Amino acid sequence: MANGQITIGSLIDIAQKGGWSAPPWKQHAGLPPGVPPAPPAPGPVSAYHPVDWAMHGDIRNARHFAGMFDGRLLYIHGLKRWLCWSDDRWVLCDQGQEIEAVKQAAHAMMTDAAASLAADQDRGKGRIKEAVAAHSISRLKATLELAQSEPGMSVGHADLDSNPALLGVGNGVVDLKTGTLMANRPDMLITRHCGADYDIAPCPRWLQFMAEVFPGDQATIDAVQRLLGYTLTGLNTEEIMVFCIGFGANGKSIFGNIGNRITGGYSKVAPHSLLAARRGDDHSARGDIAMLEGARLVSVNELPGGMQLDEPAVKALAGREPISARHLYADFSTFDPRFTVWVRTNHRPIIKGDDDGIWRRIVVLPFRQKFEGAQRDPHLEAKLWGRTRWHLAVDDRRRAPVSRFGKFGPQSGDPCRATPVSERE
């Protein structure tokens, strides 16, 4: 790509060059073994759709609506929201798209009734009357409500983005098992997408930035790239939490901001309360945890000095067990953690525990440089993003873009891995 741009997979490409082996992905429904022939994406909705006049009332209207918009609209149980297929992806109906669709269905019913009237006056008059009734707001609402139960018109919230081996990107979907770019399909149920395209291109400006932040330390650069690659996979096999530590003007904010923009819909920014120690009797709602469902990158920015970590929360967030949490005034929901938490802070947090369960999860990434005077570029982030549009690329080995610490866990002697001796002293 021109100007050394990175579209999302440079992160993966460089991680691969650090070496890895493919992980033992669990099988999920909808994961294609290779690249199967993709069914055609839904085309434009026809203004005419035949009506089964042998059926009656709201049930007929709902089935007519479902027939028109099968593969184009989905109701999400749990969210109580509709999704619509927009060009090449599912998006939430946040501008009344489902209302517009049910109005189109009512109009199509009138078109069919008018054709009946032209062919048979007696039969057509009754159908015109029913089509007119279908245009009322009460009938439109009833149509939408009953359509939720029609086959293929709804899914559970947990069904969305449920396959961690599929990664939505700007120009399709990447099968992380093979590094193959595929066209997005409605049946993949992908609603999240990275902030840039998949492409294969070198990324010299990003590599230069990494060399400036970690000068002369290729081992750390390689480890960071593996960490970034691992984060994109949605795996929780390593049970790690990354702490980017160092005082200001050292590149860590730019590093983190670019990471958030790259991961796009898979990224969440959480408040420091996510990790702050709480009273043992504090059972209040944890919206800061509930909001993380479906994320792959969770960023926590700037812990207060002297903050003690909530060690049970760290173990849960950097663990493999399902997490239960709720928003205020909402019921609990349970989900599997598919994210890696990255913390940016000037101060090392306080960890009072001495057990391996907490310390083996901590990965410390030190930012030791300080860029001052002529070394500081206030436009660097814009340059990195504008000229380095990240991509998910694969090298000549065509292996899955999964970071490897060893097999796909921490390598022995990895400079980013916290150890009981070096970090507890």
Listing of model-derived features with the role each one plays in the protein:
Residues 1-44, 79-114, 118:
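Modules that initiate DNA replication and primer synthesis
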Residues 41-77, 110, 114-425:
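Feature primarily recognizes SF3-like P-loop helicase cores of small DNA viruses
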